[in-house]
Every structure is written in structure tokens, then in C-alpha cells.
Amino acid sequence: MEVYVLFDNTWYDNSIIGIYSLDGYKTYRENLFAKAVEKLNFIVNDILNRKNAQEILAKEKIHEAEKLLPLEKEAKFNKDTEKFKQLNKKRKILLKEANKIKYNYPSTILHKHQSILEAGKDAIIDWYMDYNNIFADIQTIIE
């Protein structure tokens, strides 16, 4: 069986493979493909987890702001303008914080870049298929 020195420069690995037989090359590529898809899935899941955590935090801030509303109305009814202004300001700050948290980068990345992530998966699949085709061509030449 013939062997070849193969070099690899992948988007996440930057490594020299070494010497492999054609069968070893194919197995390596299959493993590399699986690792690439696994890494992409990890990134998507990480983004989803961050998004969920941020949504929970934003809901807590909104809930805190809603708790202040009856106190604010009571202060307005009692014509306690100083207390009303403080509560109103605090409530608005909480709502702004909730809005910032809710629409922060990690929570919107999945929505904005969903097509990029899907294209990434497609690119990995295409890349894998190209290498399988190269493998088939090399095998044909040798035979």
C-alpha cells in the first residue's frame, strides 16, 4: 500500500497530519468532518444558552420594574412628587437595562447570523465531499 505525506490547514486546527495511507486519509477526513460539525453545533448551543440566560435576566429586570409601578402610582396619588420622580427614574432605568440585556450581541447573534451558521454547516459538508472526491480521484489514478 502506498503512503503519502499529508498536510492540513483547517479553519480551526492548523496542524500537519503526517504520513497516512489512503485509507487512513479517508478515516482522518471523516473524523475531521465530524469534529467540525461538532464544533459548529457547540457554537450554536453556546449562543442559545447565552440567549436563554439573557432572556431570563431581562425578564427579572422587567418584573422588578413592574413591582415599582403600584408604588409609583401611590406616590403620584399622594402628591409626593419627590418619591414619584425617584420611583419613575428607577423603573425607567430597570426597563432600559432589561432592553439592553435582551438585545445585546449574544442574544441577537443567532437571529442575525442564523443563515451564516447554516451556510457554515453547508460549507463543511461541501468541503468534506470535495475531499472525498479528491480521495476517489487519487485512488482511481493509482489503480
Segments (PLM) and residue ranges:
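Residue-level signal for short segments within beta-strands and strand-turn junctions
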Residues: F7-T10, L22, T140-I142
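Short, mixed-charge low-complexity intrinsically disordered segments
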Residues: N14, A34-E143
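Short aromatic-glycine-(Arg/Gly/Cys) micro-motifs in beta-strand/loop hairpins
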Residues: M1-I16
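A short, exposed loop/beta-hairpin motif centered on an aromatic-Gly-Thr core
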Residues: D13-Y28
